[in-house]
């Protein structure tokens, strides 16, 4: 591997570790890192989805192991999210549109997450509500299409919605978004099959890097991080990634 590929492998390891700790797979971080390295959207999208798929699979397995996945909370978002993500995966945005759109969405999500983390009421344990089916179906479909179009997996957008609507605790949200990421990344990668030939030759090494980082992060997030810290860390990650894509 050349110096740039090694540097990205290290960056991907750190990104996967940090994101997996909060139930995310890191697609927005991978996208930001590759965009800053000069990769085209045609290569960024399938690569980010492949890396996202690896980490979300590890995260899902870890959350299943500790019994934190509630399928009642997952399937309403996935029913329409999966096909919508596959449809979005087949859509290719030009670079001048791709980066600002994704960056803006991430910044808005970060602000909402930060407000939730800093409010005293957000740190008080409350009984979460079960997501209403119709609302979850619409949310899953919209986020699925947007995430498929941008190559971001979707969990990074779904988490703020779940927490804001009190549809789950911080740990339940992390578990739900890990599964949602896995399903939507798979669907979007299938939808983006036309750009598979743009995948970098270094992808296998990057997959190993994110697998290692994701394993460590998922273990930390599922067992050791408090609910308030999960919110704070996720908001910071969202803001940094969004600002990098905007500027």
Curated annotation (Swiss-Prot):
Record keywords: Cell membrane, Membrane, Plasmid, Transmembrane, Transmembrane helix, Transport
Keyword Lyase tagged: no
InterPro entries: TM_pro_TauE-like (IPR002781), TSUP/Inactive_protease-like (IPR051598)
Any one annotated GO CC term: plasma membrane
Recorded topology in the membrane: Multi-pass membrane protein
Subcellular location: Cell membrane
Presence of keyword Transcription: no
Homology family: Belongs to the 4-toluene sulfonate uptake permease (TSUP) (TC 2.A.102) family.
Protein name: Probable membrane transporter protein y4hK
Species this protein is from: Sinorhizobium fredii (strain NBRC 101917 / NGR234)
Lineage: Bacteria, Pseudomonadati, Pseudomonadota, Alphaproteobacteria, Hyphomicrobiales
